[in-house]
Structures are given as C-alpha cells and as structure tokens.
Amino acid sequence: MKKLLIVSIMFLCFSYSKKEFIVSIEQPYEKKLDGLKLEIFLDKKKVKETNLKANNIMPSYETFDMYTSNEGKHLLEVKLKDTVFGYDVKYPEEKYIIVGPYLKKNGKIQMGILKQKEGFIFH
C-alpha cells in the first residue's frame, strides 16, 4: 500500500508541468534607448522589469520565463517610457516570444514582436 501511495505521488509530481512562455528581449541598437526601463506584464501582472542596454556591435538578448496557469489566450503588455504595447499570445501555439524596441524615423518608439511554437536559434 505504501509503494502504491509513493508511486502515485511521484506520478502526480511528474505529470504536473508548468506552462511557461519563454521571452527574449532584444537589446536596442539606438543609443537613445540606452538605460530606459522596460516592464513586461502577463494578464495585467508584472513579471519582469529591466533596463535596456544599447549595443551596436552585435545583437544581444535577455531571456526569461513567464509562467501561466492555463492554456489559451493571454494578454502580453510591454511598457517602455509612457507607452504600453499590448499583444495577444496563445499558449502553447506561441510559447517562444522575442520583443525588440526600435526608434522610428520620426523619433517615436516602436515595439516589434515575433511569436512561434518552437524555440528561436540565436547565432
């Protein structure tokens, strides 16, 4: 009986899998974006706060995990300065996400996003 209980507890522990989004923040090339605070929210909850580090030599990324309790559609919000960019993301169809801030020619900030089911390969 003890063995059955232990096996069932182990099965429950291993069968429980955390649902997570893998998010990579592309660091900007523009020096005007250096040092700006970037905040990321998932379903209105803050999950990440970081400062951008401009780099004009080669692309660099800051990667982190965001956990969610259920599958389906979620709201991903990226706040940079006083602008909030909102995106619908679906778990598990869009598990891997890259966000990247850019400056338009008129000086306004634009946020780019890539979403896909499989992981990105960075060279």
Identify the residue ranges that each predicted region occupies.
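Extracellular beta-sheet/turn segments enriched in Thr/Pro/Gly and aliphatic residues
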Residues: 90-123
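Sec-dependent N-terminal signal peptides
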Residues: 4-13
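Tryptophan-paired
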Residues: 41-72
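Bacterial signal peptide processing site
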Residues: 15-19
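Short beta-strand/loop motifs in extracellular/secreted proteins, especially
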Residues: 34-38, 74-76
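A short, solvent-exposed beta-strand micro-motif common in secreted/extracellular proteins
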Residues: 70-82
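Structural motif
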Residues: 25-36
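Beta-strand-rich interaction surfaces with strong enrichment in secreted/lumenal proteins
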Residues: 64-66, 75-76, 86-89
